[in-house]
Amino acid sequence: MSTAPKSQPVSADPVHVDSKHYTIDAENDRVRVIRARYGPREKSVMHGHPSLVAVFLSSNNGRFTFPDGRTEERSWKAGESMIMPAEEHLPENLSDNPLEVVLIELK
């Protein structure tokens, strides 16, 4: 059985294309909880997420590169949460500290 949410192809699933940074904490037929961990200055590969809630466990700055080449820098503090729309991106930790975030993907 695939662990990818039904709303995206397995090839874009971060757990499949970047298992170094993404692991599944829990999953059922309605949600999937992923933990993302990046070392200082590490980046991922292009992948996608369905709509989700992000809960940040560390304070960091990051850069997101989108399929069209556009980039966006974002900052967050430990303990913050935010609702994020479905998107494809390549994230990068711009901080000198590790980044950890829990992603609650909606199916």
PLM regions: where:
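Glycine- and acidic-residue-biased ligand/ion/polar-headgroup-sensing regions
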Residues: 49-68
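Short, flexible beta-strand-to-coil junctions
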Residues: 57, 106-107
